[in-house]
Swiss-Prot record:
It is found in: Cytoplasm. It comes from Mycobacterium xenopi. This is Chaperonin GroEL. InterPro entries: Cpn60/GroEL (IPR001844), Cpn60/GroEL/TCP-1 (IPR002423), GROEL-like_equatorial_sf (IPR027413), TCP-1-like_intermed_sf (IPR027410). The gene is groEL. Belongs to the chaperonin (HSP60) family. GO terms for cellular component: cytoplasm. It catalyses: ATP + H2O + a folded polypeptide = ADP + phosphate + an unfolded polypeptide. GO terms for biological process: protein refolding. Its EC number is 5.6.1.7. GO terms for molecular function: ATP binding; ATP-dependent protein folding chaperone; isomerase activity. Forms a cylinder of 14 subunits composed of two heptameric rings stacked back-to-back. Interacts with the co-chaperonin GroES. It holds the Pfam family Cpn60_TCP1.
Length: 120
């Protein structure tokens, strides 16, 4: 029963990460799997599940706090291109996204659709 709960948790983590950030699902999934695995190992060794949960929640708060303190705004076209290129794994795609964002501005909307036409 714990394994099924763990699998559902990992699935929910990936979905929420995708919904909120649009990227990082692999990292979030790996972290969630490690938390579930180590959590189950600790519970099997006699750890109090509620104390473990509280500890994880405190750790999440600290990590979130640290990430927010060290986060940097992505403001310039070059920064947008670099960030998008990392996410896409392709500099040309990063440049294209930066160009599109430059044209529509901060409040604009960019729609990306899959095409069956090669090269377009």
């Amino acid at each position: 029963p714990y394994e099924k709960i763990g699998a559902e948790l990992v699935k929910e983590v990936a979905k929420k990460t995708d919904d909120v950030a649009g990227d990082g699902t692999t990292t979030a999934t790996v972290l969630a799997q490690a938390l579930v695995k180590e959590g189950l190992r600790n519970v099997a060794a006699g750890a109090n599940p509620l104390a473990l949960k509280r500890g994880i929640e405190k750790a999440v708060e600290k990590v979130t706090e640290t990430l927010l303190k060290t986060a940097k705004e992505v403001e310039t076209k070059e920064q947008i291109a670099a960030t998008a290129a990392i996410s896409a794994g392709d500099q040309a795609i990063g440049d294209l996204i930066a160009e599109a964002m430059d044209k529509v501005g901060n409040e604009g909307v960019i729609t990306v659709e899959e095409s069956n036409t090669f090269g377009l």
